[in-house]
Amino acid sequence: MRVYEYGSGGSTLFFASRVARVTSTEHEPLWYSRVQTKLQAKSVTNANLQLVECDLSQTPDFENSPYVQSLRDTEADVILIDGLEDQSKYNLRPLCFALAETQIKQGGIIILDDSWRYTHLRQKNSAVRVQVFESPGPARPGVTSTDVYFY
């Protein structure tokens, strides 16, 4: 199984111990360095962490940015959208979701973290089924949600 992630971190380590290949695209250089150090410390060899910096002030054309488009060259069974949160006045994850829907193969899944911010995507998608998982937020007060879209 192959996983593609917008964003990197704990999920990169989680998937790397469970699947054949993880490709993670990270936009923040400092975070990229921290995750890369953690992967090396744990001797992870099946994760490809790539740094693709982006200018979030130019968001109106963000869907054509190298960050979003990095998914185009990757085959994945699972696509995780978990990056660029609270980084811009624009909703960036829905742009990543739109491209992910064109790239996901039949039988694949898209995971959208912090989906409580993007509930409109639960009705506007081409998934066969959507499962919503709610739980107390580990890093914020209140309940958070993660949506899993099955194709």
Short names for language-model regions:
Residues 69-78:
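A short acidic, Gly/Pro-enriched loop at the edge of an enzyme's catalytic core
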Residues 78, 84-151:
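C-terminal substrate-binding/active-site "lid" region of AdoMet-derived donor-dependent transferases
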Residues 1-58:
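SAM cofactor-binding core of SAM-dependent methyltransferases
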